[in-house]
Amino acid sequence: MDNVKKQIISILSGIRSDVKDWESNTQLVHSGILDSLGIVELIGELSDTFDIEIPPQEIVYENFDSVEGLVKMVERLSE
């Protein structure tokens, strides 16, 4: 597992400690694991951890509904 993915899973585990299985394709928003407050918290944590700015146009379902979507977004914004 790459470093970005490990860090994202660690952040998600901090937000939702009750969830134990963070598969790459688990639907985070659709399944209710992340709600609007969780997404706001996640944005702050991702920004701080990866030293990135997440612009409003990146806050879309596709980027936040899976670990894989989050990894792709973080890698893209880190370039």
Name each model feature, range by range:
Residues 59, 64-77:
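C-terminal structural segments of small proteins and small subunits
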Residues 1-21, 72-79:
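Thiotemplate assembly-line natural product biosynthesis machinery
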Residues 4, 24-25, 63-66:
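Short, conserved alpha-helical segments within structured domains
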Residues 13-33, 51-60:
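Phosphopantetheine carrier-protein modules
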